[in-house]
Amino acid sequence: MGINMLDELKEDLVGIDIRFDEPLKRYTYTKVGGPADYLAFPRNRYELFRIVKFANKHNIPWMVLGNASNLIVRDGGIRGFVIMFDKLNGIAVNGYQVEAEAGANLIATTKVACFHSLTGFEFAAGIPGSIGGAVFMNAGAYGGEIAHILVSAQVLTKDGDIRTIDARDMRFGYRRSVLQETGEVVISAKFNLKPGDYEQIKHEMNRLNHLRELKQPLEYPSCGSVFKRPPGHFAGQLIMEANLEGHRIGGVEVSTKHAGFMVNVDQGTAKDYEDLIADVIAKVKENSGVTLEPEVRIIGDKLN
């Protein structure tokens, strides 16, 4: 960006929290990721629209990062604007419906539902990430998923327009939605729940959280579940059968607590993650004949 455009950015986007050449590893669950050219934290939709309008006017690429939980940002970082929705995190309850902004924490949203004795969101009680990312990926666990409860989502198009997509038009599948094809960004979502008993809902949430603590390597940075579940198999079991528990490249290793996870144990890099993922896919294929498909998204530029 030239000096004149940089001055225009500072003038047009005055008052918005924008950080230049900001390392993204400070914000990712993996603790890896190179710099964003411009990392923006809009406080409301008006600031969001200003950022997108400026970026589109100057043909600067932009994307939303979300909570960066099921994501690997490459070591070369991301060009253009990276927009964080941390401050767009409102949650409201209207009858049996919960509406949340895209930056709302998924776990916090389940707690709000529980407080209002609304059942249906318990499956997500321990899933890290944001509402926007959860809708984008059709997040799920323990038999539940976003597709079961979503009513509609407001999305931002690449042109900066807003439209509403009903759940039936989301084309939900296993860890997928139509948004992965259109590139549209969730800015809020509405969920339909059912009345329930507060103590029973709380007990179920605590039970699922306890299971996660027992089975998942929460003590290390990670990108969550690395691979999709292959039909008729479990990814973690296939990885164990290939004797890959503890298998390590650089600072990243296959978790010995849950082989479906890869953990950053010693200042690992995104390249370590990518190399380990590729190695595990190859060795599982050789051992079982099954080709694992990554669930984690990998974005950004590689280092030259």
UniProtKB/Swiss-Prot annotation:
EC number, as in UniProt: 1.3.1.98
Active site residues according to the UniProt entry: 175, 225 (proton donor), 295
First-tier enzyme category under EC: oxidoreductase
Swiss-Prot/TrEMBL keywords: Cell cycle, Cell division, Cell shape, Cell wall biogenesis/degradation, Cytoplasm, FAD, Flavoprotein, NADP, Oxidoreductase, Peptidoglycan synthesis
Gene Ontology molecular function: FAD binding; UDP-N-acetylmuramate dehydrogenase activity
Cited InterPro entries: FAD-bd_PCMH, FAD-bd_PCMH-like_sf, FAD-bd_PCMH_sub1, FAD-bd_PCMH_sub2, MurB, MurB_C, MurB_C_sf, Oxid_FAD_bind_N
Reaction catalyzed: UDP-N-acetyl-alpha-D-muramate + NADP(+) = UDP-N-acetyl-3-O-(1-carboxyvinyl)-alpha-D-glucosamine + NADPH + H(+)
Any GO BP annotation: cell division
Requisite cofactors: FAD
Pathways involved: Cell wall biogenesis; peptidoglycan biosynthesis
Localisation: Cytoplasm
One cellular-component annotation, GO: cytosol
Domain (FAD-binding PCMH-type) ranges: 31-196
Pfam families: FAD_binding_4 (PF01565), MurB_C (PF02873)
Protein transport keyword on record: no
Family the UniProt entry places it in: Belongs to the MurB family.
Function: Cell wall formation.
Record protein name field: UDP-N-acetylenolpyruvoylglucosamine reductase
Species this protein is from: Streptococcus thermophilus (strain ATCC BAA-250 / LMG 18311)
Gene: murB
